[in-house]
């Protein structure tokens, strides 16, 4: 196949030479950027080779499976798209669109699959190349890479931070990525499994191979690509919560269970004062600071499919996967630890553990480690039976009592480790035992902490019903909860918390909503009792607007038996931490005031001190604040809220833990996690960090074990650097930035919000434009998540969830959520200034340039916006605008978008004094190549949406089911090409 057998320059995405920048009619002459933290390689040849190889495999598979005619059709489109992106001739662009419009029958599906899978395969190759370059860098003896643990530790030590301070921070730290099931993950688990196999084969090909071995691997590679081609890319039914649980658990098997202990091991070695010697005893496991969290099975906000049963299932399936791993590791240890007492001594404690193991085989009489591990295996199997109700052991076991706690398992493993270390077995312990010991401290018996989340208005309705059905209140008066003002609600809730009598009755039949909420909380209590308190720790309150929104959750916990009754001692870990989620711009502005009132309540302060270790978590929502106020206002409001929260918590001597509700797209807080953490206001990290990993970001970061290891390392390194770098200087510099630049930011934020809301909320007919000019309706039918795309039926922007909102703008290549309003804001500040601003335009420009170069918060903001603008394409977006039937509406809205896009580009160039990505020419060339494979998918999507909607208007439904399926295929491919669109 010429397309996929072509010379490497025809199919690779990341080139070392620079290609001419294509020019579109009506579009800026700018390159495009992908989201990644990557150093430029000295040689792109290995990547070129891998993409050429995978392209050749795909071409061979397509020709064999679909025939030469389809193959030639795909190749013609590919050549036309590449030629346009390289030469920039508008005639090629028109020819590409014309050829796409001619596709009929099943050809649109074949074309969509071909380009989509080529982008999937290129992503696999790029991920593999990242691993390769990091390894090559280490082999070359280069300095530590920015973002690595080694670089972080060396940097801190150079600033006078010693190991003791680092260890002290780690002993109290919390770094927790939280996997969520938001509907932007468009890949099936079946295809992800094949991706992993292809990546593994690429790794194997890097070894020195004989001709026969190489031929065998290449045949296997074609086999996997053929499997990919013959595997259905789309789901025919909507994902259930159970499906989402299993999808998430696949990343534990492939990545987290093995990689997280390795990250701990890497850090322990870096903190070791002396070089590790083979027979030096390995250090004991580090205190657990890096753990995993999950919303899957516990996030009820707007998802009627999540209830007590899904929470129970999530906890059960997590424990099942974990015990399968433990049993597998202990079984493997039994094979490894074959030391004989005829040859080497063993500790008395180890001998006692072996004797207690129940193995009386004469063949292992002199092998105490194996006998001890047989007993541990039996106890683990018994524990799994007790907790999961399943027989997970893959071998016969002796009768044994289950472990009561993970600490008991850890103690037995410590006995083995101590005996090995004392008798020349330290290098043996490092093979597997040390990693298992660390895993037990991290994962316990629960694997990951499942958060509960529900909207505050649901809590209000539940409490209102409980009060109404209870009759007279504590003071003898009936409580009409919904009719009370805020002060009265707070008073009623505090009285209820102080009273021991239950509010709910087991003899009353409550509404489905109330019964469900109480059942979830009771399931959480049961899960904590079964799997340990770490199984469920937080109850997040979406749409927190008032103090009563938080108190309501405490009252409901009292009803479910989660917190100690009034008058009883509050033990550490008692109950669930109530976590406010501030999402909209007004909520972010009120957040610090609400938290001050919360922490000033004596009963709450006591709970924070005794149950929560003087730690209180606050979650900030990036998605809804962006949808509410636009890119700049969202970011500035978040930044101000964080600074104000630091002051509130510092004044009350409470540790603040920020939980960042970030997504993949920049409009939802995406971008470099490392840079984002370092750009946080001083004092907001302090060893405490939770952040969501959502949608396609999960597979992008964690599908591959080595890539996953790097991303986890970035999170830990950034947390260490942000927390331990000298704070006085950082705080002083930040205060200076705020004093000098906050008025400018506030002025621009207000103007940007006015511009954004003027378009989205104040333009008549904008909702009609959005639903016509984006594939939002088609995305809703993609079966990519269990949660509905809208909170309510109908076409209202206010009811649309922030995630499909941003995903839709990415599909049509506008990425509006990541830049709209910025151009007008910067231009207005330059022209008129704010109160206290420099008097001249030149001086104001100098100020903004200083902010862009010296202030991390503003620099990161502009960097993320540049990434989004680089991926935008107004010429393609114009094609989507043509889907809007009302010409006047189309011209009014798209005209405003086009004008603001040009204005924003001009302002960014003015501030940075360069073209987009001019400081990264290698990436510029790479993106031109990649977009040559996304363009045909966009044009095909536009054409298919036209056909689909026309058929719906004619017949009320689409007679040809292939059309909507092909649309869904293009959505999949575009998302794969953009990589961070959700």
UniProtKB/Swiss-Prot annotation:
> Gene3D superfamilies attached here?
Phosphoenolpyruvate/pyruvate domain
Query: Record's superkingdom?
Result: Bacteria
The cofactor(s) it depends on are:
Mg(2+)
Q: Which reaction does it catalyse?
A: oxaloacetate + phosphate = phosphoenolpyruvate + hydrogencarbonate
**A Pfam family name for this chain?**
PEPcase
Entry keywords, A to Z: Carbon dioxide fixation, Lyase, Magnesium
This protein's GO cellular component annotations are:
cytosol
GO biological process assignments: carbon fixation; oxaloacetate metabolic process; tricarboxylic acid cycle
| GO function terms (MF aspect) | magnesium ion binding; phosphoenolpyruvate carboxylase activity
Family classification: Belongs to the PEPCase type 1 family.
- Give the protein's function: Forms oxaloacetate, a four-carbon dicarboxylic acid source for the tricarboxylic acid cycle.
Name recorded for this polypeptide = Phosphoenolpyruvate carboxylase
Origin organism of this chain? Answer: Bordetella bronchiseptica (strain ATCC BAA-588 / NCTC 13252 / RB50)
């Amino acid at each position: 196949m010429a397309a996929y057998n072509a010379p490497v320059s025809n199919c690779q995405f990341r080139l070392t030479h620079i290609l001419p920048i294509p020019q579109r009619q009506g579009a800026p002459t700018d390159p495009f950027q992908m989201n990644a933290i990557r150093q430029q390689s000295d040689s792109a040849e290995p990547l070129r080779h891998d993409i050429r190889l995978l392209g050749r495999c795909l071409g061979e598979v397509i020709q064999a499976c679909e025939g030469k005619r389809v193959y030639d059709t795909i190749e013609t489109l590919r050549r036309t798209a590449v030629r346009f992106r390289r030469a920039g001739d508008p005639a090629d662009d028109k020819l590409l669109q014309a050829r796409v419009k001619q596709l009929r029958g099943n050809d649109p599906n074949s074309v969509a699959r071909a380009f989509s899978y080529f982008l999937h395969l290129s992503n696999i190759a790029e991920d593999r190349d990242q691993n390769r370059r990091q390894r090559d860098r280490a082999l070359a003896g280069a300095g530590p890479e920015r973002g690595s643990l080694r670089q972080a530790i060396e940097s801190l030590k150079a600033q006078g931070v010693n190991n003791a301070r680092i260890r002290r921070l780690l002993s109290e730290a919390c770094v927790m990525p939280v996997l969520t099931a938001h509907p932007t993950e468009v890949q099936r688990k079946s295809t992800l499994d094949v991706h992993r196999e292809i990546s593994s084969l690429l790794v194997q090909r890097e070894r020195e191979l004989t001709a026969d071995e190489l031929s065998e691997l290449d045949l296997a590679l074609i086999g996997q690509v053929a499997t990919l081609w013959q595997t259905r890319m789309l789901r025919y039914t909507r994902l259930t919560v159970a499906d989402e649980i299993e999808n998430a658990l696949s990343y534990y098997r492939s990545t987290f269970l093995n990689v997280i202990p390795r990250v701990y091991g890497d850090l322990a070695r870096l903190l070791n004062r002396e070089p590790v010697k083979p027979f030096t005893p390995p250090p004991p496991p580090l205190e657990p600071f890096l753990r995993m969290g999950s919303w899957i099975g516990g996030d009820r906000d707007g998802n009627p499919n999540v209830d007590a049963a899904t929470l129970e299932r999530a906890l059960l399936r997590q424990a099942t996967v974990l015990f399968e791993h433990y049993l597998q590791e202990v079984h493997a240890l039994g094979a490894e630890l074959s030391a004989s007492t005829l040859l080497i001594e063993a500790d008395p404690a180890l001998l006692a553990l072996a004797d207690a193991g129940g193995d009386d085989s004469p063949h292992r009489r002199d092998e105490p480690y194996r006998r001890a591990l047989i007993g541990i295996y039996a106890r683990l199997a018994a524990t799994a039976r007790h907790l999961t109700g399943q027989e997970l052991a893959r071998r016969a076991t002796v009768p044994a009592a289950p472990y009561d706690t993970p600490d008991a398992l850890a103690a037995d493993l410590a006995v083995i480790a101590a005996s090995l270390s004392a008798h020349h077995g330290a290098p043996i312990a490092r093979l597997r035992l040390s990693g298992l010991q660390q895993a037990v401290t991290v994962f316990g018996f629960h694997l990951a902490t499942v958060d509960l989340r529900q909207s505050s208005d649901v809590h209000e309705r539940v409490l209102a019903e409980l009060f109404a059905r209870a009759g007279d209140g504590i003071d003898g008066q009936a409580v009409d909860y919904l009719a009370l003002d805020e002060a009265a609600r707070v008073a009623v809730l505090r009285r209820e918390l102080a009273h021991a009598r239950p509010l709910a009755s087991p003899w009353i039949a409550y509404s489905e909503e109330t019964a469900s909420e109480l059942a979830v909380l009771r399931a959480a209590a049961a899960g904590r009792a079964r799997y340990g308190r770490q199984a469920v720790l937080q109850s997040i309150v979406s749409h927190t607007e008032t103090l009563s929104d938080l108190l309501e959750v405490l009252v409901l916990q009292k009803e479910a038996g989660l917190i100690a009754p009034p008058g009883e001692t509050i033990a550490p870990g008692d109950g669930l931490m109530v976590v406010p989620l501030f999402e909209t711009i007004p909520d972010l502005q009120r957040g610090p005031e609400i938290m001050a009132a919360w922490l000033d309540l004596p009963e709450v302060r006591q709970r924070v001190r005794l149950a929560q270790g003087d730690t209180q978590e606050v979650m900030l929502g990036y998605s809804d604040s962006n949808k509410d106020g636009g890119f700049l206002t969202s970011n500035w409001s978040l930044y101000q809220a964080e600074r104000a929260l630091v002051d509130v918590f510092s004044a009350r001597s409470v540790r603040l833990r920020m939980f960042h509700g970030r997504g993949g797209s920049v409009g939802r807080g995406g971008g470099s996690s490392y840079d984002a953490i370092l750009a946080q206001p001083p004092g907001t990290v302090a060893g405490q960090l939770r952040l969501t990993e959502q949608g396609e970001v999960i597979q992008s970061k964690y599908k591959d074990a080595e890539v996953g290891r790097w991303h986890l390392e970035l999170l830990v390194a950034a947390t260490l650097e942000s927390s331990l770098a000298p704070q006085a200087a950082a705080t002083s510099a930040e205060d200076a930035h705020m004093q000098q630049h906050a008025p400018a930011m506030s002025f621009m934020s207000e103007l940007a919000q006015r511009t954004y809301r003027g378009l989205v909320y104040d333009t008549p007919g904008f909702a009609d434009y959005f639903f016509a000019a984006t594939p939002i309706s088609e995305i809703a039918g993609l079966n990519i998540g269990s949660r509905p795309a809208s909170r309510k039926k109908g076409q209202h922007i206010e009811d649309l969830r922030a995630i499909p909102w941003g995903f839709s703008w990415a599909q049509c290549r506008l990425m509006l959520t990541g830049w709209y309003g910025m151009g007008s804001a910067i231009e207005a500040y330059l022209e008129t200034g704010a109160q206290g601003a420099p008097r001249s335009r030149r001086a104001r420009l100098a100020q903004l340039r200083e902010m862009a170069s010296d202030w991390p918060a503003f620099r990161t903001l502009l960097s993320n916006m540049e990434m989004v603008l680089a991926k935008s394409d107004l010429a393609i977006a114009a094609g989507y605008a043509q889907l809007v039937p009302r010409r006047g509406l189309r011209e009014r809205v798209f005209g405003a978008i086009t004008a603001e896009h040009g204005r924003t580009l001009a302002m960014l160039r003015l501030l940075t004094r360069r073209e987009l990505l001019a400081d990264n020419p290698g990436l510029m060339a790479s993106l031109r190549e990649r977009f040559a494979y996304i363009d045909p998918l966009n044009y095909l999507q536009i054409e298919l949406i036209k056909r689909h909607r026309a058929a719906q208007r004619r017949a009320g439904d689409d007679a040809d089911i292939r059309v909507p399926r092909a649309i869904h295929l293009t959505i999949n491919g575009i998302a794969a090409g953009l990589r961070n669109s959700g």
